[in-house]
Amino acid sequence: MESAKRVLVYLTKENSLLQCAKFAQGITGHYSANNGDKAFIHCGLEKNQFVISDCQFLGSARVQLQRPSFCPIKNLSPRQSASLPQEIQGRGVDVGVAVLVQSINKKVLLTRRSKSLNIFPNVWVPPGGHVELGEQLLEAGLRELQEETGLRLQEVSWSMLGLWESAFPPLLSRGLPSRHHIVTYLLVQTNETHQQMQERLCPDEREVSACVWLDTEIAKHIVAAEDSGSPCGPLPASISVLELIHGSLSQSDRSMATFLNSAPKEGEDIERISTGTKYALSLWLDGMPTNSSPCA
């Protein structure tokens, strides 16, 4: 079976027996009051199973789990759920890992997914992917980082920022879900500046079409626009990005508006920062020292 080759999500609540999460099961709603969109949970990787629990267990981390209000899994009707193909219903819930690399000068790296990818094409996300059997979360994240960007990090410190429940397509208006993930966002801090790491960037053009380093001020605008519908204070007109053109990185300017886009409710997707990435940026900012920024 395909599921035997993947690390899947397993659930336990109120000391119940550990069970493999079902594809059409809302994970966040399972642990939140009144089927809400956020919950604090305990989680950890055990024997190739990603365990989520409402109780602490050996080696677990306590973090926030969240999903968007428009989550397709949450909004599936019983009839829609029953109409899912059997191979989809039997998939379970996959585990993804995404690495928010922070330089010593407080910038984080995002990559734009290639337009040729089937899932979330042309969307800005941190480097990441699936956890393979036998891997630990950090090990999987650093492997994906190297495969996608060419960056190989040696001495790092890290922590788990939070979990995000993700489905694709991201809205029911674009079709029934065919993928369901719990994405584990890891903050990986290095002792290098972003310029030092940028010199070693060598993205795989099959997966990545551009890279950008975001500082805290830009991140605050992005998060504020997602939360309130408008950025906090004056905005730069553009952001400098590194576009991958014919195998080489070239610096160019990208409109700031692109990074404030939200997922359209209907029609084709657009270039934007993924909703889960905005959530991860908000958690990153929450952990930063308070300053006098107008967005603080």
Curated annotation (Swiss-Prot):
Role, per record: Acts as a decapping enzyme capable of hydrolyzing monomethylated capped RNAs (in vitro). Hydrolyzes monomethylated capped RNA after alpha and beta phosphates to form N(7)-methyl-GDP. Shows low activity towards unmethylated capped RNA.
Gene Ontology MF terms: metal ion binding; NADH pyrophosphatase activity
Protein's name according to its UniProt entry: m7GpppN-mRNA hydrolase NUDT17
GO BP terms, alphabetized: NAD catabolic process; NADH metabolic process; NADP catabolic process
Key words, A-Z: Hydrolase, Magnesium, Manganese, Metal-binding
GO cellular component, one term: peroxisome
Reaction(s) this enzyme catalyzes, per UniProt: a 5'-end (N(7)-methyl 5'-triphosphoguanosine)-ribonucleoside in mRNA + H2O = N(7)-methyl-GDP + a 5'-end phospho-ribonucleoside in mRNA + 2 H(+)
Organism: Xenopus laevis (African clawed frog)
Record domain Nudix hydrolase: where: 90-236
Enzyme class: hydrolase
Source superkingdom: Eukaryota
Cofactor(s) required for function per UniProt: Mg(2+); Mn(2+)
EC number(s) given by UniProt: 3.6.1.62
UniProt xrefs under PROSITE patterns: NUDIX (PS51462)
Motif (Nudix box): 129-150
PANTHER family per UniProt: NUCLEOSIDE DIPHOSPHATE-LINKED MOIETY X MOTIF 17, NUDIX HYDROLASE, NUDC SUBFAMILY
UniProt record similarity statement: Belongs to the Nudix hydrolase family.
Annotated residues for binding of Mg(2+): 144, 148
Pfam families membership: NUDIX
